[in-house]
Amino acid sequence: MDLMRAILDGIAISAIFNGAVAVLALINPRYFDSYPKAIQKAAPEQMTEKEKKINLVLTILICGICLIYSAASLLHTGISGFWNFFWMGYFQWSILNLGDFFLLDCLLFQGKYKDRIVIPGTEGHPDYEFGNWMRHLAIMEHFVVTPFLIIPFVAVIQALIVEL
């Protein structure tokens, strides 16, 4: 396993993912359903079917690009074996997850551009406050669900693809 390569590839897919999500969230925050449920329910207008479809397409597109990049990079590492591919993928996607937490949840959603990514009609909702945001969304998402469920699943799929 090439740990340095895994770290660099993780930074690259993190930049792709977080850059795309940040730009799209700033364009229209309603395109993403990654807000705490209380904020989503407080919105005067719920996500329309069109917005849900856009969310699904963007999610598949952005994650697909990251998966293709990551798998292609693994093919060119010169390593072999399912477990080597799995752990390289796990490290890559873990770095993306940490980038998502620090860049999107901490800096974008809680930082300088906080007012630009508010769903219209939910201004001043208490779940936009840092502590509530972390408690109701970010901690569970980034330190429980993603590292123990989503990343292992994606790393297995990626390792199987690369092994073929």
Name every feature range the model reports, one short phrase each.
Residues 2-20, 83-102:
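Alpha-helical transmembrane segments
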Residues 4-5, 46-58:
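Membrane-water interface at loop-to-transmembrane-helix junctions
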Residues 23-44:
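Membrane-interface helix-loop junction between the first two transmembrane segments
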Residues 39-51, 118-138:
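Short membrane-interface loop/juxtamembrane segments of multi-pass integral membrane proteins
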Residues 55-74, 139-152:
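Core segments of transmembrane alpha-helices
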Residues 69-91:
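Cytoplasmic juxtamembrane interface segments
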Residues 103-124:
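Juxtamembrane non-transmembrane "cap" segments at the membrane-aqueous interface
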Residues 153-164:
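Juxtamembrane boundary at the C-terminal end of a transmembrane helix
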